[in-house]
Amino acid sequence: MEFTVSTQQEDYNLSASVRRIGEDWLVAIWGGDQPHIGAVGMAQARPSLDDPNRSSATASVFCYVGHKEDEVVKKVSEQLAARLDARVVVTAGLHWDRISAEGIARVRCNVVQLMALIEARIDAAESKRGQVS
């Protein structure tokens, strides 16, 4: 399975390329004036510490000096790993010159929307095939 999704907001839009590699998943997220790789998050599913019947995930994050995408890759990799019960690697590179605090808040909202788009595509594939492939 491989696909690309993008948010369609007024501004601060994000795109993601999602690819299944065996049982694992690779997600690249980019947006802004200078898309790049600023951080990488690697997450693995595990039973929740609060409720072993629920799935959770633990992530390790690597971030280049001066980059702030660590928050994005941690959130997305953990959420997808728990949802898919799989190992997930997420890269992100987002850059807008002189972004305001309001702009950062809008980017965070777009990350949530991007996650919903990713999960909807995976759900559609599961429904169509009876399983994720």
Placement of each model-derived feature along the sequence:
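Conserved mixed alpha/beta catalytic, RNA-binding, or beta-rich assembly cores of soluble enzyme
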Residues: T7-R83, R87-W96, G103-V111, L117-A125, ...
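Short amphipathic
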Residues: M1-T7
